[in-house]
Every structure is written in C-alpha cells, then in structure tokens.
C-alpha cells in the first residue's frame, strides 16, 4: 500500500563514539510485512527499538502511524523481544488479562480469546509461565503483544525456540495478522524473509546494504536469489532452516 505506517528519515543513533545506525531511511506500509536481515551487530535491534519508542534518534526522525513522541508510539506498538519478558508465576491467561488491562483494551475478553487461538495456546491457558517450554514462552510473548490491540507489531527474531511445525503455523498467522496491522520483524533466516515479506532491508554495520523485494535485491546484485545477494552484500554466512 502507498500509505506508510512507519517511517524513519535519516535516522542515526550514536552511543558515545560508537555509531549503531547511520542515515537510515526506512518505511513500512500499512497492513504489510517488512523484514530486517543482517548479521549480529548490523543495527536491526537498534531500528526496532527506535520504532518502539524505546530509544531516541541522535539525529533524524521516527514516525509511527503519524506519531513521533515515544509516549504516543508505545501505546500503539506490540513488541515481541527475542527473549520473552514474562512474569514466571502468572498463568498464560493471567498474563494476557493483565496486559489487556494495562492498555484498557475494549472487548478484552474477545481479544484474549483471539490471541490464544492465533498463538495456539488454548491447551496451556491455565499453566504457569515457569512451567512452559521456550517455544511456548515465545508464543505467550506474541499473544501478550496482540492483547494490547496494536496497530504495529514488532518482532525480534520471533521464531527463536520454535520447532519447524510451530514456525510454519506462526508464519501463517503473521500473514493473516498483516491483513489488519503492520508487521515488522528481524531475522537471521533468509527463508523467513522470502516467505513473509514483500519489502526487505539488509543491514551491514549500521547502514542499509540493500532494500527491495527478494527478487529485486537478487537482480540488483547480479545474484540468482536472496541468499546469494545476502552473502554478497554482507560477506556473512547464511542460516538455513
């Protein structure tokens, strides 16, 4: 779609003398899936934190659904970190009820029911988080984000800890979610980006090394596919599933 839900203009972030990201121009359309690829330390997490309103740009501009103040952005963002941030002694249901309450979500019961269904959690709804596997914790983290009724969903390495079947199921659900909200995620997995994204950004050392569809990135770099292009522009190895 032509309307952008998320926009970064000339975004630069410095920590003391270290530049985490430099002159980043990034957009994510409404009701779309946008992927960030890159090796560790490339700047993916910095961009995600900026989109979530967790950090300020040193220079440049960040806009999410027309909002630029972090306190406004945080109200419309659902964030799923690579390592789930969950209260160990709460049950799955209690976790979601608490999250919906914090955001004063309308129709909270329906939102929770939908999140449980999307994340395949109905069979563990009464289980405490501390008794769940890593894969289940990741799904609870996603369900928690959905309960805040976000306009933009941000996922950092969302498939970490999931088995192949769970990964495919979650990808299918993300595609469905993108019919209603904007989804932005980071990943090391080429197949994940190809499967889900029409718009892909490849980062290297804090700058955008390539941007476009999987096909256009490959073509622009004289490669047969996105895997070859990723290796060429980053000089890194590739993670297959």
Task: Identify the function of each model-found stretch.
Residues 59-75:
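Conserved ABC transporter NBD signature motif
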Residues 97, 101-124:
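Conserved ABC ATPase "signature" region
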Residues 153-157:
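Catalytic Walker B motif of ABC-type/P-loop ATPase nucleotide-binding domains
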Residues 167-179:
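Helical segment within the ABC ATPase nucleotide-binding domain
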Residues 211-212:
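ABC ATPase "signature
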